[in-house]
Curated annotation (Swiss-Prot):
This is UPF0173 metal-dependent hydrolase Rsph17029_0942. It holds the Pfam family Lactamase_B_2. The keyword Hydrolase applies. PANTHER family: UPF0173 METAL-DEPENDENT HYDROLASE MJ1163 (PTHR43546:SF3), UPF0173 METAL-DEPENDENT HYDROLASE MJ1163-RELATED (PTHR43546). It comes from Cereibacter sphaeroides (strain ATCC 17029 / ATH 2.4.9) (Rhodobacter sphaeroides). GO terms for molecular function: hydrolase activity. Keywords: Hydrolase. HAMAP family: UPF0173. SUPFAM superfamilies: Metallo-hydrolase/oxidoreductase. The keyword Hydrolase applies.
Length: 230
């Protein structure tokens, strides 16, 4: 299994026979090198989105049309994109599980907000979500944009993820200290990868507080387009 950061909250996850592009905001992403776009997209099988905000949907429609990839996410958002943009999609909802190239992806709760920008104002796109991605003997908890929430308790107990990809840059999501607290209290991770940080000055620029708060856990600060093998 390989997890590759695309900057901000974007990832390329190669698991089982699937290559998932998660929240692929590439164009205009200060951390993503535009001249390496093909490297990020090569072999992708699905696009997995957590919610409707532009720094997460980003290049979703362009990539879906260019590569013929299905967009996977919460029903309201995927249905709206299908109707407006004519793309393929797999819409489901909290508690539902879909199998993507042998990987089992279950949608779970997050606490944030979700909308897309429209000419007349924000467009409702369902609610925000996270995912449990199971395959190759591992379970990844992809938090999506979220703060700490009590639901993490049963999510950790039921799904037992060993890898956490946690939004932890603060301001719009939990910060590094809160993410460390959530990981300690609700999960038993072997590996934690922070995201949604370093992109803008108002976000946290380092994961040191996360590392300090998780002794005994491997906290990996991702580098853009450098695969992490699990």
């Amino acid at each position: 299994m390989k997890i590759t950061w695309l900057g901000h909250s974007g990832f390329r996850i190669a698991i089982e026979q699937a290559v998932l592009l998660v929240d692929p905001w590439l164009t205009g992403n200060p951390l993503f090198p535009a001249d390496r776009r093909e490297e990020a997209l090569a072999g992708a099988t699905h696009i997995l989105i957590t919610h409707g905000h532009g720094d997460h949907t980003g290049d979703t429609v362009a990539i879906a049309k260019e590569r013929g990839l299905p967009v996977v996410g919460i029903y309201d958002l995927v249905t709206w994109l299908q109707e407006k943009e004519g793309i393929d999609g797999i819409g489901f909802n909290k508690g539902g599980t879909v199998t993507l190239g042998g990987a089992r992806v279950t949608m779970v709760q997050a606490t944030h907000s979700s909308s897309m920008s429209g000419e007349a104002g924000p467009i409702y796109t369902g609610t925000e979500s996270g995912y449990m991605i199971a395959g190759e003997g591992h379970v990844i908890y992809l938090s999506g944009d979220t703060d700490i929430m009590a639901d993490m308790g049963w999510m950790g107990e039921y799904h037992r993820p060993d890898v956490g990809i946690l939004s932890a840059g603060g301001h719009f999501t939990m910060d590094m200290k809160r993410a460390a607290f959530a990981a300690r209290r609700y999960f038993d991770f072997r590996t934690v990868i922070p995201c949604h940080y370093r992109t803008f000055p108002l976000l946290e620029q380092s994961a040191e507080a996360l590392k300090e708060g998780l002794p005994g856990v491997e906290v990996i600060e991702p580098q853009v387009l450098v695969p992490i093998e699990i």
